[in-house]
Amino acid sequence: MGTTYDIATKQSEPGQDSRAPAVVVEQLRKSYGRLKVLDGISLSVNPGATLAVLGRSGTGKSVLLRLIIGLETPDSGSICIHGQNIVGLALDQMGEIRKRMGFLFQHAALYDSLTVAENVAFPFVHHRKAMSGSERINRVNQLLAEVGMEGSQGKMPSDISGGMQKRVGLARALALEPEILLLDEPTAGLDPISSGEIDDLILKLQHERQMAFIVVTHDLHGAKTIANRLALLDQGNVVIEGTYEDLQKCDIEFVKEFLKQS
């Protein structure tokens, strides 16, 4: 089963240019035993645009991100990154593709035994071996400044708040200058003020970097703030994809109920 309700009108905002989509997912299916998680999902996002993927817990939102970044393999369907289907690629080829993508895990996933600076430098150590120590330090400082975490280089993850950990995770995700940024519940577990600050930071990065963003979230308020388009998932399918205004106009009962409860 594919998309149930499709919005034909596309936003004439960022990402609606002559460039090909950064990410195209077509008829993606994924099951774990008898549990069908994704059942024919099709989505796309252009360079410079942001797609927010919404839905209740267990609808496959995070699984979708793991498939896009190549951490899991779909049962069927295709995932094209800048026109190249990554399904079935060899590990070394997938490694090269993954360098073009940044990923922020739901819980920031910082290394507890490393300082903030060491966490942000981690991608450089493993993927930019020719970079000198001074270059690495300068780049780490620039990235931390970009996410508003100046002066935190020597702190441990346990020394900073959840919102700050998300910022450091974002800095690390940006280290290799990705063309695509995947964010898994970037405001989960944060208070409203911290959530708003993360949303503001995402908007800032959108403006400055013009990447393609895919954001998985439960937070409808944040989603409509940061995203050009929203996709609502249920039972492994896209129920509706469009602008927030499109969702408000939709007469599907599930969509109405989701908006009411969010």
Question: For each predicted feature, which ranges?
Answer:
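Conserved ABC ATPase signature
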Residues: M156-I160, M164
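Catalytic Walker B motif of ABC-type/P-loop ATPase nucleotide-binding domains
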Residues: L181-D184
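A short, proline-enriched helix->beta-strand linker immediately N-terminal to the Walker B motif
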Residues: A175-E179
